[in-house]
Amino acid sequence: LFFLATEFGIYTSLDAGNNWQKLPGTPTISFRDLVIQERENDLVGASFGRGFFVLDDYSALREMTKENLSKKGKLFKPRDAKLFKPRNSLGNTGGQFYIAKNPTYGAVFTYHLNDVPSTSKSRRIRSERMLNKDMKDIPFPGYDELAAEMEEKSASIILTIKDSNGNHIRNIKKNASKGSGKIAWNLRHKSYYPVRAG
């Protein structure tokens, strides 16, 4: 696994430098320095005049081999989650009022999906875009078809959490999309009070 700072962003190679691709989310600007924080598997890139950027936990990139990415779906090994009580208080902010978004609390799982079933609505929109691109008329689908689209559920993934004895702890649901994504578990059991008064 290689990282490269360039005049046009940060690039990575998953195959010892044979192929390079730009890291998604990094701006197209000059990066002058890269530092790897080995304990947490974080990559820090210092740009020229724009500050610095942190890629939290790049360990999933190590498992993104051709074999793993060609599978229908792959769940990558997560890093150990830290159990602590998150605080909402700002505390003492000193002379400045600097606030940044904290990383997601709990266990964060990275996954890759090669294909996701499409819905009738997404297929219709794709077809309408092609017709629009070719400067053709877009037919009205009809009220029945639009009503059926509203009832249709989109594809989702369900992550099942179990303890070391195989006992069910919790299911976590997220809308599915093609490519890589992350889903987090806040280290809590499922609620035994699904309906609350009030």
Task: Give the positions of each predicted feature.
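Beta-propeller blade termini and top-face loops
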Residues: 1-97, 104-107, 114-116
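Short, solvent-exposed loop/turn and secondary-structure capping segments
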Residues: 15-16, 54-57, 64, 121-124, ...
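Surface-exposed loop/edge segments in extracytoplasmic proteins
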Residues: 19-21, 165-172
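Short beta-strands and strand-coil junctions in structured, solvent-facing domains, enriched
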Residues: 42, 116-120, 192-194
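Contiguous beta-strand segments within globular domains
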Residues: 85-156, 182-184
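Conserved aromatic beta-strand anchor motif in extracellular beta-sandwich/beta-rich domains
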Residues: 159-163
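Glycine-centered tight-turn motifs at strand-turn-strand junctions
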Residues: 168-198
